A protein has these predicted regions:
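Extended catalytic cores of very large enzyme megasubunits
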Residues: 1-171
Length: 171
């Protein structure tokens, strides 16, 4: 991975020698995720990020960044969270089913859809049947899958938080 990125800047043998002698130290995040994961999305190459929570999209964007292995700092100061919409007084179950895809993008997109429905006063259900089981190998990023349980827990927590705060803003 690194050899592709440094072409023309430093001869590869010289770069390898400098790393071996500990004269330079590449980013451990970049080394850990080098290859298809980092080529697909460079978010995995960052140690940390920051965002204000001033839009409902902040939640799924933070989730995606975290799923890439990057830390997320956030601000919930009044000038930011006051921009979030009010939660409806009544949240009613609807027949809508959110189909969750088995990817970081799929999980974040499903959270965005859930929060969108909740802000419209709707409580949909979700189908996590496409998510690989806990312990399955992750082909691109490496490691093992958590299975759908953590996402189901997050969705239930989110619905409960919206119900608890119905008729007002999240704060």
């Amino acid at each position: 991975f690194m050899s592709e990125k440094v072409k023309g800047h430093l001869p590869i043998p010289q770069l390898k020698d400098a790393i071996t002698k500990l004269e330079v130290m590449p980013s451990m995040r970049a080394l850990m995720t080098a290859g298809p994961a980092l080529e697909r999305d460079n978010t995995a190459g960052y140690n940390c990020s920051y965002m204000p929570v001033d839009d409902p999209k902040s939640f799924d964007e933070a989730m995606y960044i975290l799923l890439c292995g990057t830390g997320v700092g956030f601000s919930v100061e009044r000038q930011y969270v006051s921009k979030l919409p009010d939660i409806p007084e009544v949240l009613e179950k609807v027949d809508t089913v959110i189909q969750v895809q088995d990817s970081k993008e799929g999980w974040a997109k499903a959270l965005r859809k859930l929060i969108g429905h909740l802000y419209m006063g709707e409580v949909p259900t979700w189908d996590v049947s496409k998510i690989r089981p806990a312990g399955a190998r992750l082909k691109i990023f490496g490691g093992r899958a958590s299975g759908p349980a953590p996402l189901v827990d997050l969705f239930n927590f989110t619905v409960n938080m919206f119900r608890y705060n119905s008729g007002r803003k999240l704060s």
